[in-house]
């Protein structure tokens, strides 16, 4: 006999007395205790202690029946002991009306469910449908067909309207595109025409510029040559006027020829001269008054005009400039009128009518302008006649007539003193 381990037995007793495992079968309890390493004697002792010493024979029989497999393999198991008598079966419970009611309702529900299932799912598959059902199905199908047909008709109408709108829009777009193309072509043509006209204008401007430059150069050359000649003449006149004749004896002037006298007469009759009156007096006296023996030399007898009566170079240049500008403007105005007359004669008629009206409105101003032009022409003639006259070297220093005669002749000619005429010219 092996010794019983108290610690293991007490732990097994505590395990068996646990209320949580009280309802579990005894065989499982014994298997669990044996799995913890307890032997058969310790298991029996634990079972006895857990039951408080009662039923030792039953415990022993249970322990022997649930012994481990090792002991069973070595020793044949003993059959369980037969009980002393058989117990009677317990009587059947009595059934109340409630039980019958529950059974009736359950059978009624089950039977109704079976009927519905069979009538709805089984019989339609087994038996053909009735005529009423077929007619109802036909009516439903006809209604669906009519609804679908109406939907198709509305869809076709909407589609046709949409197609018409798209066609109208496409037509409008094509019209706008054609208009845009026409506008673009017109603008391109206008741009080309403008470019060509600009080119022509540039060429015309260049040609006008070249002609103007040439005219200006030619005018400059002519003006410079004329100014040179005028300056030379002025220098000669100043030298003759400023020269002092006191140092030289006065020689008798030779008789003027007929040509010089004619030239001087034409210069006198042509109008107011462009040079001072005092410079033309010696020539006239030379022709009209022959030299006499009574005339003596001296500053009192000489006719020397004052320096203020001689026109300055600035005045002469201004006159020449105004004259060239007037001639140039008149020539350009005539060219412009000819070009306008070729292009648009109505403008020329309007311009001439306007000019006639202006001439009627301002006749006095036109007369003044004509007088000025005549005076300028007379001055030009006088200058040309002076150039044609050849002055003798010392005959111009001959005695001049008395101042009374000079003033009387000048007043009889124009009514204005000679120095005023020289200043005005």
UniProtKB/Swiss-Prot annotation:
Ranges for region Disordered: 49-89, 247-425
Cellular compartments per GO CC: peroxisomal importomer complex; peroxisomal membrane
Topological category with respect to the lipid bilayer: Peripheral membrane protein
Gene3D superfamilies in the cross-refs: Winged helix-like DNA-binding domain superfamily/Winged helix DNA-binding domain
Keywords tagged on the record: Membrane, Peroxisome, Phosphoprotein, Protein transport, Translocation, Transport
Domain of life the protein comes from: Eukaryota
PTM description: Phosphorylated on serine or threonine residues.
Entry-linked InterPro entries: PEX14, Pex14_N, WH-like_DNA-bd_sf
Any GO BP annotation: protein import into peroxisome matrix, docking
Molecular-function GO term, any one: signaling receptor binding
Disulphide bridges, residue numbers: none
Comp. bias regions, Low complexity: 56-76
Compositionally biased spans, kind Basic and acidic residues: 315-324, 333-366
Keyword Protein transport recorded: yes
Motif (SH3-binding): 89-97
One Pfam family named in its UniProt record: Pex14_N
Similarity comment: Belongs to the peroxin-14 family.
SUBUNIT field: Interacts with PEX13 (via SH3 domain); forming the PEX13-PEX14 docking complex. Interacts with PEX5 (via WxxxF/Y motifs). Interacts with PEX20 (via WxxxF/Y motifs). Interacts with PEX3, PEX7, PEX8 and PEX17.
Function in brief: Component of the PEX13-PEX14 docking complex, a translocon channel that specifically mediates the import of peroxisomal cargo proteins bound to PEX5 or PEX20 receptors. The PEX13-PEX14 docking complex forms a large import pore which can be opened to a diameter of about 9 nm. Mechanistically, PEX5 (or PEX20) receptor along with cargo proteins associates with the PEX14 subunit of the PEX13-PEX14 docking complex in the cytosol, leading to the insertion of the receptor into the organelle membrane with the concomitant translocation of the cargo into the peroxisome matrix.
Name used for this protein in its record: Peroxisomal membrane protein PEX14
Organism: Komagataella pastoris
Gene designation: PEX14
């Amino acid at each position: 006999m092996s010794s019983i381990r108290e610690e293991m037995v007490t732990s097994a007793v505590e395990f068996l007395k646990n209320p949580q495992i009280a309802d579990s079968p005894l065989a499982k309890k014994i298997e669990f205790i044996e799995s913890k390493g307890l032997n058969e004697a310790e298991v029996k002792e634990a079972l006895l202690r857990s039951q408080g010493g009662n039923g030792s024979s039953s415990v022993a029989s249970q322990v022997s029946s649930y012994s481990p497999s090792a002991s069973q393999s070595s020793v044949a198991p003993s059959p369980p002991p037969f009980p002393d008598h058989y117990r009677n079966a317990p009587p059947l419970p009595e059934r109340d009306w409630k039980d019958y009611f529950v059974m009736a309702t359950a059978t009624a529900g089950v039977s109704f469910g079976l009927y519905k299932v069979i009538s709805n799912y089984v019989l339609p598959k087994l038996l053909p449908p009735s005529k009423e059902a077929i007619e109802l199905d036909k009516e439903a199908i006809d209604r669906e067909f009519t609804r679908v047909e109406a939907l198709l008709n509305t869809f076709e109408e909407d589609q046709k309207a949409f197609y018409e709108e798209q066609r109208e829009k496409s037509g409008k777009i094509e019209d706008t595109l054609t208009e845009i193309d026409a506008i673009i072509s017109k603008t391109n043509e206008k741009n080309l025409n403008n470019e060509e006209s600009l080119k022509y204008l540039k060429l015309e401007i260049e040609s006008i510029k070249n002609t103007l430059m040439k005219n200006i150069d030619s005018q400059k050359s002519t003006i410079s040559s004329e100014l040179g000649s005028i300056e030379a003449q002025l220098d000669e006149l100043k030298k003759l006027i400023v020269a002092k004749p006191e140092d030289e004896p006065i020689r008798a002037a030779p008789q003027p020829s007929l040509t010089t006298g004619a030239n001087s007469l034409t210069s006198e009759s042509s109008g107011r001269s462009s040079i001072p009156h005092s410079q033309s007096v010696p020539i006239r006296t030379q022709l009209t008054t022959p030299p006499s023996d009574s005339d003596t030399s001296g500053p009192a007898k000489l006719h020397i005009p004052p320096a203020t009566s001689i026109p300055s170079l600035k005045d002469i240049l201004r006159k020449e400039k105004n004259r060239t500008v007037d001639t140039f403007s008149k020539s350009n105005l005539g060219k412009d009128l000819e070009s306008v007359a070729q292009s648009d004669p109505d403008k020329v008629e309007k311009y001439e009518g306007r000019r006639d009206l202006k001439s009627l409105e301002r006749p006095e101003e036109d007369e003044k302008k004509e007088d000025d032009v005549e005076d300028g022409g007379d001055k030009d003639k006088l200058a040309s006649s002076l150039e044609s006259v050849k002055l003798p070297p010392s005959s111009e220093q001959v005695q001049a007539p008395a101042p009374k005669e000079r003033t009387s002749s000048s007043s009889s000619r124009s009514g204005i003193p000679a120095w005023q005429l020289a200043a005005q010219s």
